[in-house]
């Protein structure tokens, strides 16, 4: 899925929402695509999560939008991908049975915390108040 939102952070959230939706609505497809190696061979390091062309462009947009370095934006993206993949994997394998809404709220809270960790002031985080409920 290619994100369509103007805001880089919101576009990234669109991808996370779609990822979790696949895990919940079609767990066998999720397992086939993301857990059984369909999308390529295992990587030697975590940097592989953020080095594809789409993510590199998103990192540049997030960096510019939030006035943080590309390195900080990269760490934010990487941490959020790992967290989202973990939640989606727990859902697809039946370990948790939360609603998509609950899972996205959890992902959004973690993503906001990752932004703060990378030096983004709370007032610059889109929808901070909503995700902290």
Language model: regions and residue ranges:
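Amphipathic alpha-helical packing segments from all-alpha helical-bundle domains
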Residues: 42-67, 74-78, 105-119
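Hydrophobic alpha-helical segments that form the core
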Residues: 71-93, 105-113, 127, 131-133
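Hydrophobic alpha-helical connector segments
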Residues: 1-28, 70, 80
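Amphipathic alpha-helical segments used for helix-helix packing
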Residues: 24-42, 89-97
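A generic structural signal for short
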Residues: 6-8, 47, 126
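Short, surface-exposed loop/turn segments at secondary-structure junctions
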Residues: 2-9, 41, 96-100
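Short amphipathic alpha-helical interface segments enriched in basic and hydrophobic/aromatic residues
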Residues: 20-24, 59-63, 85-92, 115
């Amino acid at each position: 899925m290619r994100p369509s939102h103007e805001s880089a952070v919101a576009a990234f959230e669109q991808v996370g929402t779609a990822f979790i939706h696949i895990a919940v609505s079609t767990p066998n497809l999720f397992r086939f695509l993301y857990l059984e190696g369909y999308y390529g061979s295992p990587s030697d390091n975590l940097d592989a999560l953020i080095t594809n062309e789409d993510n590199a462009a998103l990192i540049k947009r997030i960096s510019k939008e939030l006035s943080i370095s590309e390195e900080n934006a990269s760490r934010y993206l990487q941490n959020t991908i790992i967290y989202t993949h973990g939640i989606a994997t727990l859902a697809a394998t039946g370990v948790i049975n939360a609603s998509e809404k609950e899972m996205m709220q959890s992902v959004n809270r973690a993503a906001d915390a990752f932004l703060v960790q990378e030096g983004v002031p709370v007032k610059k985080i889109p929808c901070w108040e909503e995700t902290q409920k």
